[in-house]
Curated annotation (Swiss-Prot):
Keywords: ATP-binding, Coenzyme A biosynthesis, Cytoplasm, Magnesium, Nucleotide-binding, Nucleotidyltransferase, Transferase. This is Phosphopantetheine adenylyltransferase. Substrate binds at residues 9, 41, 73, 87. Belongs to the bacterial CoaD family. Its EC number is 2.7.7.3. It comes from Syntrophomonas wolfei subsp. wolfei (strain DSM 2245B / Goettingen). The keyword Zinc-finger does not apply. InterPro entries: Cyt_trans-like, PPAT, Rossmann-like_a/b/a_fold. It is an enzyme of class 2 (transferase). It catalyses: (R)-4'-phosphopantetheine + ATP + H(+) = 3'-dephospho-CoA + diphosphate. Gene3D superfamilies: HUPs. It is found in: Cytoplasm.
């Protein structure tokens, strides 16, 4: 079985992330969306909230499941016996950063490859940071994120903003 891991903070998950999952789910038998718990980053959504939002946003993808982890990605990949890391690319800037990360991961875990998937052109400008900023300033992010995420952002803005 070909198992791949799509790691990220996903704060929040965007339509760009879902696009990458839809593409990669056609290639791998199973994909784990590995939500990173990074104590050095201040997240808008809690780890549990991010996991739930991704689960709800990927219900249509039968071979995708969601998990949370902290620590070194290499250790997580070895534990899950993954064969690949999934990464999405929007622009050349993404490629440069992701290539460095792929090389580092290859050094740490030589038997695992990084697979790059190009974002659909309609998603190249979407980032979680931009979505959060737009939502915080009252922008309509409905075309940028799954409906459940839009609702979650609106709730956050009402309760926290």
């Amino acid at each position: 079985m070909k198992l791949a891991v799509y790691p990220g903070s996903f704060d929040p998950v965007t339509n760009g992330h879902i696009d990458i999952l839809e593409k990669s789910s056609k290639i791998f038998d199973e994909i784990i969306v590995a939500v990173i718990h990074n104590v050095t980053k201040k997240a808008l959504f809690s780890l549990d909230e991010r996991v739930k939002l991704i689960e709800e946003s990927t219900r249509h993808l039968n071979n995708v499941r969601v998990d949370a982890f902290s620590g070194l990605l290499a250790n997580y990949l070895a534990d899950k016996q993954a064969c690949a890391i999934i990464r999405g690319l929007r622009t050349v800037t993404d490629f440069e950063y992701e290539m460095h990360m792929a090389m580092m991961n290859k050094k740490l875990i030589p038997n695992i490859d990084t697979m790059f998937f190009m974002s659909d052109s309609q998603y190249t400008f979407i980032s979680s940071s931009a979505v959060k900023e737009a939502a915080l300033l009252g922008g309509d992010v409905g075309s940028l994120v799954p409906a459940v995420v839009k609702a979650g952002l609106e709730e956050k803005m009402l309760n926290d903003g």
